[in-house]
Amino acid sequence: MFKFFWRCYFLSSNDLDKLTVNELKEIAKDLEIKGVYKYKKNELIEEIKKVSPMHIEKNGVVLREKIVPKSGKSKPEGINIEENSNRVESFQGDKIEDRRKEQDNNKQEENKREKLREMINESDTAKGVLEIIENNNYGFLRGKNYLTGPDDIYVSPSQIRRFNLQTGDEVEGKVRTPKEGEKFKALLYVQKVNGENPEKAVRRRPFENLTPIYPQERIKLENSSSDLSSRLMDIISPIGKGQRGIVVAPPKAGKTTLLKKIAQSISINHPDMKLIVLLIDERPEEVTDMQRSINGEVIYSTFDEEPEHHTKVAYMVLERAKRMVEQGQNVVILLDSLTRLARAYNLTINPTGRTLSGGLDPGALIMPKKFFGAARNIEEGGSLTILATALVETGSRMDDMIFEEFKGTGNMEVHLNRKLQERRIFPAIDIYRSGTRKENLLLSEKEYEASFNIRRLLYDENNTQNVTEQLINMLCKTKNNDEFVEVISKIDLSKEKNR
């Protein structure tokens, strides 16, 4: 400090001019001048003159105070006592002022928190399926059919990042009414994600990083003695959790009815599984019938909608299913139909410049294959089962091409036979062509032997219709599949036929 006073008392303007820039900066720092590095030499000199209390300029003459040694009686360093006390008082005053400001800020923050708590408590609770807008960070909670509507709820980018939210998440929370100039309600507070604690969504693994394995746990379809189609499928083409199945059917063979019965069986026998029925390009009356017949979620896009509508609905359903599987849930999607979904993509994609037989663009199969290929059993827990219908014998070369492309992608197939349907033999399941890969993982030893015997008989007889009719008659005479398997193991079907 003495160095500082010494410099200021004994340096005139000429003396300052003689100093280097670095020396001037040191003096400026002692005088507590801020931002000394941004000034040039002349500017530094001016700033030092402004704040230096050690000189008085009068008529252009600088009057400097000289330091004169005083007698011993005088107080040592008496000049600085009053100045130091003033500085202490000033410092204490500044400290008190800072403390007051801090308290005021804390009160304001507390008031804001209190207002936010009141707003959250008074707000309505709502939920919806999140759709994150592409090329943007924000999203909306969709309602009916996972599509845009007037009751959508805005979700901010900060909430999406905080809870690692993705398209397809079902978010539940408190919402506020739209402010002036806003169109949609806004999400204030996230309470649940996919029905669970939001913190669980933060730590989840992406669907693509989960390990797919063969289905090992069976989805039992049999629920009554009169439901013959479900009982026959349990023996001939069993379904496991994580199955990727395709129902191949000509028109009017009963594919929609078969899907409906499968949906009813799953909702009865496996109420813990999440069931979604996706109807693409279907008739409106079939949508109503399906909604009234099953206990599950029915998402639809009828044939009078645009192809873009079909593809958007399918995309949202797939993302919704993936998010549930990531949290360890077992999900079943029943799609009717895969053929019409591929047709919709054929109309909406950018043309690749190549065309397959029937006018099918190869690029139109990319998204339907992603949809169908998402079905898998997860080693870490959870599964996504997809059963999709494919149309054949429609007279359209495109439909045949679509089926051929998906023919080897599934691990379970059920073929419906038009000739059986014409003979009024229901269910019209072609036993010879239907089956499941690795069925031994799903069937018991007795059931596997019964299935093997039936197929061997079909090969020997080479008459699918007669053998199918015999099997259906035997199913009608037995109360359940256990009894049916016992009968199959004891009776030679070829002798039964000759009677």
Label for each model-derived stretch:
Residues 262-266, 272-499:
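P-loop NTPase catalytic core
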